[in-house]
């Protein structure tokens, strides 16, 4: 199924004409497909043994080149104050496991600058998640705006890097990571307060709690249990013929239901099946 989402990229320009031109670059059908295919924006990325390290730039390479050319032409013409920067206030990753909690493994997720050849985490924007701790939410906050430039053969921007460690014997998908962010392009750049990478462990979803009403089968079982509990007969104080010693003789004893609240009824009431889990 083709990706049908929309890019969350925003622009910060004072000129309506330049803003419209930049909007066409960012929100064209091709640009939207690139955001999905190259960046996995809003999509689930599966971590497999044959894909143990994943590097996803926050801006597609083709889109990066077109935006950089747009800002450069405006800068050379004296219309813009810089060659352009990309600002990402926050990156949010939702991580879920796809194997048993007994599997020994972990994920290392961090935010580097592609201008750094070593791809080191910027400002300690790095977290490690063990398999038995999942699901979890991870957040990153860059402390600066990244210049739209080319370093060597790399288009400089931020990226999300995911490393899979351990999971011996598991060659398939062990975790799913869904990343979302909002990239802004501007001719101005700034620095921001340092905020450490966040890691929030999330309770697994309780599917049974969503079933607020008993099912048809549960209602049927409940009615049957109630009927069984009400079909009780006890001996009354009627006199029995003491001379009837033959085992073949039948004792005809009336058995009306016990009065509510009587000690005899309470004894039988204690043997009624208990109803649990809403049955």
Swiss-Prot record:
Cell location: Host cell junction, Host plasmodesma
Domain of life per record: Viruses
Keyword list, A-Z: Host cell junction, Transport, Viral movement protein
Pfam families: 3A (PF00803)
Biological process, per Gene Ontology: transport of virus in host, cell to cell
Main location: host cell
Any Gene Ontology CC annotation: host cell plasmodesma
InterPro entries named in the record: MPV (IPR000603)
Function: Transports viral genome to neighboring plant cells directly through plasmosdesmata, without any budding. The movement protein allows efficient cell to cell propagation, by bypassing the host cell wall barrier. Acts by forming a tubular structure at the host plasmodesmata, enlarging it enough to allow free passage of virion capsids.
Protein family (similarity comment): Belongs to the cucumovirus movement protein family.
The protein, known as: Movement protein
